[in-house]
C-alpha cells in the first residue's frame, strides 16, 4: 500500500510541477507528459498516437520528470506557492495578524536558498 501512496504522491507532485513549469518544456515534452500524467494514457497509447516507440515515450517522460524536479530544486516556485497559500489561509482565518503576515510574506519573497 505504501508503494501505491508514494506513486500517487509522486504523480500528484509531478502534475503540480508541470502546471508551474510547463512553459519551460518543449512542445513534445508537454504533449507526452500531459497525456501520461494528466490524461492517464499508457505509454503504449501515447506511442501509438504519435507513431513512435514506447521506449521513446518512456525516455521523454522520464527526462521531463527529472527536469521538473530539477527546476523545482533550483527555483522553488511550488514551495513558495505552497507557503503563500498557507499564509493567505492564516490571514483569512485570523490565525496571524497583518504585521506577522507582512513579515512572513517578505520572508517568502526574499527567501534565500
UniProtKB/Swiss-Prot annotation:
- InterPro entries recorded: RNA_pol_sigma_r3/r4-like, UPF0122, UPF0122_fam_protein, WH-like_DNA-bd_sf
Its domain of life reads Bacteria
Pfam families reported for this sequence: UPF0122
| Disulfide bond sites | none
Note the SUPFAM superfamilies from the entry: Sigma3 and sigma4 domains of RNA polymerase sigma factors
Q: What is the recorded function of this protein according to its Swiss-Prot or TrEMBL entry?
A: Might take part in the signal recognition particle (SRP) pathway. This is inferred from the conservation of its genetic proximity to ftsY/ffh. May be a regulatory protein.
As for family, the record states: Belongs to the UPF0122 family.
Cross-referenced HAMAP family: UPF0122
What is the name attached to this protein's record?
A: Probable UPF0122 protein
